[in-house]
Amino acid sequence: MHMLLFIGALALPVFVCTQSCEPASLSPRLAGVDLEKFRLTPNAEYVDSDQQIPISTTNVGLIEQSYVETAIKLVRETFPNATFRLREDHYVGDNGVAHVHFRQTVHNLDVDNGDFNVNVGRDGSVFSYGNSFYTGPVPSITQLTKRDFTDPVAALKFALTHLQLPITAEDVSVESTKHPHKYVLRGTSGAVTNPKARLVYFVKPDGTLCLVWRVETDVDDNWLLTYVDAKTAEEIHGVVDYVSEATFQVYGWGINDPGQVDSRAVLTDPWDLKESPLTWFRDGQKNWTTTRGNNGIAQENINNLPTYLNNFRPDSPTQNFSYEYPAGGSPKDYINASITQLFYTANAYHDLLYTLGFNEKAGNFQWNNSGLGGKEKDYVILNAQDGASRNNADFATPPDGSPARMRMYLFTHTTPPRDGVFESGIVIHEYTHGLSMRLTGGPDNSRCLSAFESASMGEGWGDFMATAIRLKPSDTRATDYGMGMWVYNNEKGIRQYLYSTSMETNPLNYTSLNRMWEAHAGGTVWASMLYEVLWNLIDRHGKNDGPRPTFDERGVPKDGKYLAMKIVIDAMALQPCNPDFVQARNAILDADQALTGGQNKCEIWTGFAKRGLGQGAEYGRGRRVGSYDIPGDVCQKKI
């Protein structure tokens, strides 16, 4: 049986609103509460591949036992007095670099923001590493032995009250789990799932260590980890939000929005069996005849229901998903076309990311991993025309093994409203949140893009990937792009500036961050830097306008566009938890070193230096010092 997709040439749109398409705080839908003040404070360091790493290793190649032992040895030599545990999400990327992750412990409890990631090269030696381990005095175990801390219900109630969460908890019961300090809190109402609480240590913004309850609450709009002081249950030390606010007849891959073409296209079996061996409709157990499969499940959620399995989705016994999309029609009239478009774009992006290295081992989103590593049963829940909000889109990324959730909304800047799923850049931007959160810090840790600069880069990566995908054959480095232009009916889009290599059109640079406090604004700075790097690489290597990259014998994309995307993705897995701009830049340089032997240092340094992130650029709490210098031995050039 063949599947027909009516896909319009809606090239992947350039825009995707993560937390909020309009300027917004960390969690815009928490009325009266600004979660920005609870963002985690970055405390990571990153030792890149250019620095000498003093550890002796046996170069036996990447055998699992050997690369894990090498990583353990590095952690022990770096922090000889620290205790820690090896996480289970280590893997070898398709660039040949192994990624091993550790969590610091104190008195057998996790230090929840104490992370150490080790990257081991093809030869078995340490390539680079990052860490945010706590190095101060360890608190006495007395607080634990005497149980001098509050119960988890008190912590939950304080979080609900202080953050004004729409959950009632008047008659809560505590259920123990296999973990001695982890509990399920039953008897609440208003949450998608039962809240959870876990006793952990937490490094506070002032650098001290304290015992906290990590309270997990999912209310759709916000999926929070709230760190409540365990002694008093009257203070919140930090908050992480998993939600980032972004035959088929469809707008095809590379078509950004309906404004670019007159009609949609009909596609037959558009998947690639190397990337989706079960196709888009099978999950290893059943061959579905609706918009459901191994990579995602798409449905309408007009009434903002908390569940999704029984929501409406089109069904075709012949897998012929061709539906009308009338120009100027009411959104409800084309709900079948909307769901089909969302299912298509998400699956197509899954397949592209797979070939660029975001596979099962790396923590991608699939129900069935076919024994290829990683945790299963975590496809993406795709809600079209979700009734929870307007003029927005969002993506929730829990750790590997739990389904992600994308909610696409209607945009009311036109009459009738426009459906965000038809601007594929929004879908791409949102899905990229899942990519960057699963790779940064490892698949089992979704808390590593929670500081201001790291969250900003989370937004910037989404804009960058959406923009790179929508490039047209006629584009040059003089081509400018906006984000959200179609849904907002505005040629300038929703960002402060267009993405451009012209400093007159877009003057943003590294020190612009000193005047910014919101992640979407900061993300525009990061994406502007990546846009410079993108065109530098295209000018050197050319541009492949096809839907998939071609690789040389080393696994390196042969063109500049896909090479830029590949290096950016590889760097996410190298960088530390909650990186800053300087560390992320260094990780991109390291990614090129691992993939090509550093053949593109000049192009990368030149792109970053043009916008103030050159050699010598520095980050210090809230204050950045820019630099336009390029290392003298890289390309003998200074901006």
UniProtKB/Swiss-Prot annotation:
Transmembrane segments: none annotated. It comes from the Eukaryota. Induction: Expression is controlled by the prtT transcription factor. Its main location: secreted. It is an enzyme of class 3 (hydrolase). Its cofactor is Zn(2+). GO terms for biological process: proteolysis. The active site is at E430. PROSITE patterns: ZINC_PROTEASE (PS00142). Glycans are attached at N287, N320, N336, N368, N509. Residues 17-245 form a propeptide. It is found in: Secreted. Its EC number is 3.4.24.-. GO terms for molecular function: metalloendopeptidase activity; zinc ion binding. Keywords: Glycoprotein, Hydrolase, Metal-binding, Metalloprotease, Protease, Secreted, Signal, Zinc, Zymogen. Zn(2+) binds at H429, H433. GO terms for cellular component: extracellular region. Residues 1-16 form the signal peptide. CDD domains: M36. It holds the Pfam family FTP. Binds 1 zinc ion per subunit. Belongs to the peptidase M36 family. Secreted metalloproteinase that allows assimilation of proteinaceous substrates. This is Extracellular metalloproteinase NpIII. The gene is NpIII.
